[in-house]
């Protein structure tokens, strides 16, 4: 779909104005609204609240489509926009509707089977297709603006553009640029007027910034179409413009964590988690709604190096588990509004019931998806679970690798690389995945592979595979010989997520956790013999990893032999359907194990 920037920006300007006007109309709770302004010794003051969500990932209801029951975790969190809507309604009633804004920091349309269904099964892009459930819910909640997340691009630009059309609020991305013109491909900002009791409006600018890693993670969807420069440089460009346009308050909605780190190393010159750097380097920002990192930060202050101003950051927990509140207090001074004080906190969505309006609005869509994921596609001879997958070779991960290797072998049949052995990588995306004995449903398989990754075949050498395995082994915490091994504390060294620990099928190897990172992988063998450095292999690998996700060595620069446009999840579902019966005895094997001084840990 062509990127008609002018048409979109005209639409966004109209939409943004409509949002701002709606926020200015007197609503129920007008008495509370009037109380938000006041005078003390002749000084005019005004207070307002900006509410924020992030990383909703397709969660409307407090429901887990993979387990087919209400969501629950060890902390008894709840999820979904229906819960958040109840919190939003309470804040609007308390503060006064016209004294609030509601924004989001991205990753909205990917992550659940609900969002998948309306991207792929009953797609919103079809002629006369449905309105995306996330658009319906967010429109009903009167969102004022939302930044783009990296996962917005997972289904391709046409799906994103259709979602954008269906939203009654602007999608913001000041650093999502048209690759040819280098002009914004989305609205960079939105401007909102809040009417005060004094007749002097407060102008609030929301600047949206997305993640530079999109260029790596969704290379197939964006290469040659869009480019994604760093957050710091784009904020430095736009914040002065917003101030010159009369913005009294500038809020950044950033789909970027605050740690200053990048999972992709030096593959890009831009920082992945740059929200803290933006606050530190760019003057004129009052608050930053942080996203992407899936961490909870109720309130965090960063000092701007140029002005000494304290900038408040807040990140609400993912999936609608928390709602951020930025509470602003302004004072009228020297002919304009000045921020006198701003603080942040989060509200827990498990303290309220779901908003019945949202439940009624989307109950039909929910039931369609529940019926879809419960379709039986085959049988399984023995239960498989991922509970021990981070530290043991288990059949459920072997299943992923078996299907991937089988798919690549078939794809390369008759080609010059058909005779090469095929290795495959897989990671544990969920420690709660389970494929039961007996009937297997779509949700059983989908729960094992929760990301929209596609499959590629790359050409790798033995030496490169050794380096790949060594990098993956950084995932484990060094544990001295004789020390007690606690599986709960053994993994995720230096914050490495489970999805960045790959196991490789087709090779046998050991990981010595007593050794320091970088020298752990030993006894690497292929077909019983020591792995030769010059041996050549076809490597079945997901597109996230193949494009540099996780910064694994060699794979991103390796030769591409084949790629598939369909998700690995769908490939797995189709494989189970075609086979009809799954038996772990046919593919399960202990290819790798953890050791200390040659002695197995488990």
Where are these regions (language model features)?
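Alpha-helical structural context
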Residues: 281-282, 383, 407, 411
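Extended, charge- and Ser/Thr-rich helical segments
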Residues: 342-346, 365-366, 380
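Short, solvent-exposed loop/turn motifs
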Residues: 201-203, 385, 508, 530
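Acidic, metal/ion-coordinating pockets
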Residues: 2-19, 23, 29-351, 396-403, ...
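Glycine-rich phosphate/diphosphate-binding loops and the adjacent beta-loop-alpha structural elements
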Residues: 375-393
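Acidic, glycine-rich low-complexity/disordered segments
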Residues: 363-374
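Acidic, Ser/Thr/Pro-rich beta/coil linker or hinge segments at domain junctions
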Residues: 350-357, 373, 379-380
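Feature captures C-terminal
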Residues: 41-49, 59, 72, 79, ...
């Amino acid at each position: 779909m062509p990127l008609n920037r002018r048409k979109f920006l005209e639409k966004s300007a109209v939409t943004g104005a409509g949002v701002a006007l709606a926020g200015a109309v007197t609503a129920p709770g007008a008495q509370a609204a009037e109380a938000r302004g006041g005078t003390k010794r002749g000084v005019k003051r005004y207070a307002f609240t900006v509410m924020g969500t992030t990383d909703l990932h397709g969660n409307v209801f407090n429901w887990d489509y993979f387990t087919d029951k209400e969501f629950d975790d060890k902390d008894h969190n709840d999820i979904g926009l229906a819960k958040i809507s109840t919190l939003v309604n309470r804040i609007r009633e308390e503060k006064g509707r016209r004294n609030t804004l509601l924004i989001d920091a991205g990753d909205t349309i990917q992550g659940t089977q609900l969002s998948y269904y309306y991207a792929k099964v009953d797609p919103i892009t079809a002629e006369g297709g449905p309105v995306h459930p996330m658009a319906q819910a967010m429109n009903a909640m009167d969102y004022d603006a939302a930044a783009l997340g990296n996962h917005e691009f997972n289904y391709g630009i046409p799906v994103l553009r259709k979602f954008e059309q269906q939203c009654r609020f602007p999608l913001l991305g000041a650093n999502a640029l048209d690759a040819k013109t280098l002009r914004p491909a989305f609205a960079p900002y939105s401007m909102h007027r809040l009417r005060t009791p004094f007749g002097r409006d407060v102008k609030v600018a929301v600047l949206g910034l997305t993640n530079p890693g999109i260029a790596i993670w969704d290379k197939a969807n964006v290469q040659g179409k869009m480019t994604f420069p760093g957050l710091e440089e784009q904020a430095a460009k736009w914040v002065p413009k917003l101030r010159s346009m009369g913005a009294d308050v500038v809020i950044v909605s950033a789909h970027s964590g605050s740690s200053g780190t990048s999972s992709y190393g030096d593959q890009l010159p831009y920082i992945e988690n740059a929200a803290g750097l933006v606050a530190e380097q760019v003057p004129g920002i009052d608050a930053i709604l942080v996203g992407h990192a899936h961490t909870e930060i109720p309130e965090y202050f960063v000092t701007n190096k140029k002005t000494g101003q304290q900038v408040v950051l807040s990140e609400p927990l993912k999936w609608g588990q928390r709602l951020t509140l930025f509470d602003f207090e302004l004072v009228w001074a020297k002919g304009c509004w000045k921020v006198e004080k701003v603080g942040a906190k989060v509200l827990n969505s498990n303290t309220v019931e779901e908003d019945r309006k949202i439940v009624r609005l989307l109950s039909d869509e929910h039931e369609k998806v529940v019926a879809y994921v419960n379709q039986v596609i085959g049988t399984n001879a023995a239960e498989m679970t991922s509970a021990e997958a981070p530290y043991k070779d288990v059949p459920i991960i072997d299943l992923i690798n078996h299907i991937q290797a089988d798919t690549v072998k078939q794809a390369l049949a008759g080609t010059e690389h058909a005779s090469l052995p095929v290795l495959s990588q897989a990671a544990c995306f969920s420690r709660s995945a389970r494929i039961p004995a007996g009937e297997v449903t779509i949700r059983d398989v989908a729960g094992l592979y929760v990301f929209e990754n596609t499959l590629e075949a790359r050409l790798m050498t033995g030496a490169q595979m050794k380096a790949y395995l060594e990098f993956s082994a950084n995932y484990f915490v060094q544990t001295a010989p004789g020390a007690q091994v606690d599986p709960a504390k053994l993994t995720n060294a230096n914050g490495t997520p489970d999805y960045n620990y790959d196991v490789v099928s087709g090779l046998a190897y050991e990981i010595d956790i007593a050794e320091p990172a970088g020298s752990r992988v030993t006894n690497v063998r292929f077909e019983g013999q020591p792995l030769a450095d010059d041996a050549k292999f076809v490597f079945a690998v997901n597109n996230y990893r193949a494009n540099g996700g996780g910064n694994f060595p060699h794979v991103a620069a390796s030769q591409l032999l084949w790629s598939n446009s369909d998700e690995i999840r769908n490939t797995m579902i189709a494989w189970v359907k075609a086979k009809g019966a799954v038996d772990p005895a046919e593919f399960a094997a202990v290819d790798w194990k953890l050791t200390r001084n040659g002695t197995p840990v488990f």
